[in-house]
Amino acid sequence: MEQSLMDKLTILADSAKYDVACTSSGASHPAKRGTIGSCYAPGCCHAFTADGRCVSLLKVLMSNCCAFDCSYCVNRKSNDVPRATFSPRELAELTIEFYRRNYIEGLFLSSAVLGTPDYTTERMLTVLRLLRNEYHFGGYIHAKTIPGTSPELIQQMGYLADRLSVNVELPSEQSLHLLAPDKGRHSIFRPMKQISVAGEESRQELTLYRHAPKFAPAGQSTQMIVGASPETDYHILQLSEGMYQKYGLKRVFYSAYIPVSDDTRLPALDTKPPLLREHRLYQADWLLRFYQFKADEILDKDNQSFNPYLDPKCNWAVQHYGLFPVDVNRAPFEMLLRVPGIGPNSARRIRDARRLSALGLDELKRMGVVLKRAQYFIICRGFSGAHPGRGSAGRERITRALIDPNVFSAGAEQLSMFAPPAVDRLVEQGVPPRAAQRMVREEAVQCLARAL
């Protein structure tokens, strides 16, 4: 039976929902005369899916008919799911019609491996050429590079798309070999290096000739699945830092593994996605990108997992409490970034404003400093610090101020997303959810207070 365009869209949009490497553009180029669409740095429109994930653009697969059999993937060839494939013309027309109706502002295009990586990429390139050359589409395009694609095709794709991405998927070669035997380390990192080198060459050409063609002007990103394999948070964070430094990635996305396969090599189907762990990885990733932290400072070989109760920055501050309090009127910019409650924008405002006069609490509050957390780590004009002292009451006070409220948020939805295992166990034993949260919170407060 021949599938309608709407049937294909329903199947292939649903098949793409597990790919989270999709965000606002990061590239800026205004509309040109005679073209349709524009791409601005603030990014394309965003939408929230039913499961709470933020997605943007028309996110769809070219095909979900896959020649690979990655055990963690819903589109693997051995899985019995509805299959569909767009023709290049169908997908190009669908994108441009959605754009004209103001449904979307760009396209996120990926695909299962239809036959071979090169054949799949050639079909994706046909879509991009139709959009750019025939329909004169000037909007944002994020294209997924298929591992194993030839360098020539990747080069062509880079001049048609605003951003490219190659998904690492699993954090180690051993896990790739076990769960995705059709993929290998070389097939992933070779195109990643090629995109990095080509992007740098393109930027250098633009300094000499402003009309030189741009290669993936919004850079590249990748995605890792968290919880499908046994790698620790420390291992994942080390890998992310290495990719940022070696390949100049714009983003590393983390996706909590959602069980889709009854496979003994994977977590059981009733396993809850590790959403709190995913959340902590994003927080730590932010510290790497914007707060001048190193991966070894956030986690180390002796502590390879994130603290479930404190965010990574607060956890670092508690572990290094001897470095505090810092005088915000004298502390180096790098140290200001490490104070809980002070972000990059607030740190820059403090650095600029203190040249004119000494700052007090009122000024810090106006600059966006979160004093509820920062007060335990700073001194300033007219304020000598709200330090916990040596008593247990003081230690509990700072712990209660720093503990992550998301872990103990009330309500079934938040409980299912962020509750630590201890809360789940108490609820299963018949303890009301709110009471279970209070009990675990008090135990966590006591443990963290003793660590100060």
Per-region residue spans from a language model:
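Flexible, glycine/charged-enriched surface loops at secondary-structure junctions
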Residues: 204-212, 254, 294-300
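Long C-terminal interaction/binding lobes of large macromolecular proteins
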Residues: 1, 214, 234-245, 275-277, ...
